[in-house]
Design a protein with these regions (language model features):
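PAS-family sensory/regulatory modules and their coupling/dimerization elements
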Residues: 461-509
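Iron-sulfur cluster-binding cysteine motifs and their immediate structural context
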Residues: 2-4, 9-12, 18-42, 47, ...
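Iron-sulfur-associated redox domains of electron-transfer enzymes in respiratory
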Residues: 64-363, 382-390
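Signal-transducing coiled-coil/dimerization helices and immediately adjacent hinge/linker segments
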Residues: 520-578
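Short, charged amphipathic alpha-helical "coupling" segments at sensory-output junctions
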Residues: 398, 402-419, 513-516, 520, ...
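Sensory coupling linkers of modular signal transduction proteins
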Residues: 493-538
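Sensory modules in modular signal-transduction proteins
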Residues: 408-441
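PAS/PAS-like sensory domain cap-loop motif
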Residues: 440-450
Length: 578
């Protein structure tokens, strides 16, 4: 039976989520839902592969930690077994491998064995079934790959081997041998195993799943140093080549169906792209068995490994350990039931959207014309159309589109400039006019100013002082009787844009009501704040994508606000902040 309300194995630290959409981009099945800029994992869609955990640059994605559950088992059960996944040979230093059994016994485990003993039994059963069936069968050792087939490739469910994973095979063996009340803790590199242990039809077999990372933390917290542990034998070790299971092609080699890359009887697939493209292969090529591993290069690259070694060194460690003499009694054939049932369980009913609905969203984001659909991927989706479908499905937001948000920000900036009663001019570093609003054109009695040097209209000296860095903020009266100019000039550099901004506040004639001056200055403060907030908002949207910062701009504009307010004093409807 499918899991109707899956318990999430991956969640989000909202305080660390920075709107970078990296998790959306790397999730193989787009199981990330973005609401109000916060990215969260949809447990129904999630495969538990842990790609988002590994890829999140802010550490905002994290898998569920089950260490308290393991500690509780050791306190409440009379007998608890530890099953160590074969990837441990790549996760720990070679000198530490035979010290792990002693360390686990110090934690309180009564039985310590390699999960590879279950892998050997599953491989033997897989080989027998593969020889009986004509269509290529799909191995079921990887829970993320099984979840992908059940949720997103239901037509391939009949091809799944009707066998449990090595973890479940080992758990059934332990329960059959030591009693149903025996506790069973699996330790490996896989986050998806946490979800597999909670499948309703397998409930009660695996009591707790830990990662190698959690085990390392546990040993550290208990003050257990592997360097001070003696070498010790496992209670059971696998037969044959089962220690190869965590590397690409390992299960096929264990089953005796692949002697090398030239063998046409089996296909080893690792990484999502390989799974997506290769799972549906037909029997024309003579393939009997397909081994899918969601993590590229296999379980030695799982998200639960904390290792500074590169993937190839980890693989070499596993290969060497598989050839080393075995320490401990070899497990005999098991009488445990290895059968399993799998069935299609799409995460949600298929949602169909009309072309008109899609067109409307494209129009709303300024991408109605094909040439405006950049397909840049900044939002995390491969194409603009994919992003629109996600928006309609409630998985994404229009605001995730960077070009759309930039256009909106630019339009808002233009609106602020055009509605301001003050003259606003934007200059490049050569002090040529890039943009000027209508109020500035009226102030200098000219139009079509773009490209013209500012010196043709006002004294350039204040802008030269700002451009040279002589002053960070210029704020002083600017009078030119010959040109009929009487204003207060506030000039400052725009952050990260290599541009200067100038705001000209018209000064009243002598004798004019002082309240008008105060009102104008208040309006200037408001406009400056709006410009600041606009810059901050634009930077927030683009910072992770463009790598820019706005701290200096905020500081300068705040100085501007403080300078104007300190001279004007508190006004009616004061704009001051606590």
């Amino acid at each position: 039976m499918p899991v109707l309300e899956p318990r999430a194995v991956i969640d989000t630290n909202e305080a660390r989520c920075r709107d970078c959409y990296r998790c959306v981009r790397v999730c193989p099945v787009k199981a990330i839902r973005v609401v109000h800029g916060q990215a969260s994992v949809d447990a129904r869609r999630c495969l538990g592969c842990g790609t988002c955990v590994r890829e999140c640059p802010q550490g905002a994605k994290r898998y569920r930690r089950d260490l308290p559950k393991a500690e509780a088992l050791l306190k409440t059960r009379k007998f608890v077994a530890a099953s160590l996944a074969p990837a441990f040979a790549g996760a720990f230093e070679p000198w530490a491998l035979l010290r792990l059994p002693a360390a686990l016994r110090r934690l309180g485990f009564h039985y310590v064995a390699e999960t590879a003993v279950g892998a050997a039994w599953v491989a033997q059963a897989s080989a027998g079934l593969a020889r009986e069936r004509k269509a290529p069968l799909i191995c079921t050792a990887c829970p993320a790959a099984v979840g992908y087939v059940e949720k997103y490739r239901p037509e391939l469910v009949p091809r799944l081997l009707p066998l449990v994973s090595p973890m479940m095979a080992h758990a059934r063996h332990v329960k059959a041998r030591f009693g149903a009340e025996a506790g069973f803790v699996f330790i490996g590199s896989c986050v998806a195993k946490k979800a597999e242990a909670e499948r309703p039809e397998l409930a009660g077999l695996v009591d707790c799943v830990l990662t190698f990372e959690e085990l390392a933390d546990w040993l550290r917290d208990q003050g257990i140093d592997l360097g001070h542990c003696e070498e010790s034998a496992f209670d059971e070790v696998p037969s044959g080549s089962a220690r190869l299971f965590p590397v690409e092609g390992g299960s096929l080699a264990t089953a005796g169906l692949a002697s090398g890359p030239q063998d046409l009887g089996a296909a080893a697939l690792s990484g999502f792209e390989a799974l997506r493209d290769g799972l549906g292969m037909g029997q024309e090529g003579g393939v009997q068995l397909i081994e899918p591993l969601m993590c590229s290069h296999g379980c030695i690259n799982g998200p639960g490994i904390r290792s500074e070694e590169n993937i190839f060194d980890r693989r070499l460690r596993v290969l060497r350990f598989s050839q080393a003499p075995k320490s401990g009694p070899e497990a005999a054939a098991t009488r445990a039931d290895l059968s399993a049932r799998y069935q299609a369980c799409p995460p949600s009913p298929a949602m169909a959207f009309s072309e008109e609905q899609i067109r409307q969203v494209l129009e709303q984001t300024g991408k109605g014309r094909p040439e405006n659909q950049l397909n840049c991927g900044a939002c995390g989706y491969a194409s603009c159309r994919d992003q629109v479908l996600a928006v309609l499905s409630g998985m994404a937001e229009r605001e995730m589109c960077i070009p759309y948000m930039r256009r909106m920000a630019e339009q808002r900036s233009s609106l602020i400039m055009e509605t301001s009663p003050n003259g606003i001019v934007i200059l490049d570093r050569d002090l040529s006019i890039l943009n000027a609003n209508t109020a500035f054109e009226k102030l200098v009695h000219a139009s079509s100013l773009s490209g013209q040097p500012i010196s043709q209209y006002v004294d350039p000296d204040p802008f030269e002082q700002v451009a040279s860095g002589q002053v960070a903020l210029y704020d002083a009266p600017c009078r030119d009787e010959a040109r009929g100019l009487s204003a207060r000039l506030i000039a400052y550099p725009l952050p990260n844009e290599d541009r200067l901004a100038g705001i000209f506040v018209a000064l009243p004639e002598p004798g004019e009501d002082a309240r008008q001056l105060r009102r104008l200055k208040d309006e200037t403060v408001l406009q400056a704040r709006e410009l600041q907030e606009q810059q901050v908002e634009m930077a927030r949207q683009f910072a992770n994508y463009l790598g820019q910062h706005t701290a200096r701009g905020e500081q300068l504009v705040k100085k501007l606000i403080k300078a104007v307010e300190s001279e004007a004093g508190p006004a009616e409807g004061s704009l001051g902040r606590p």
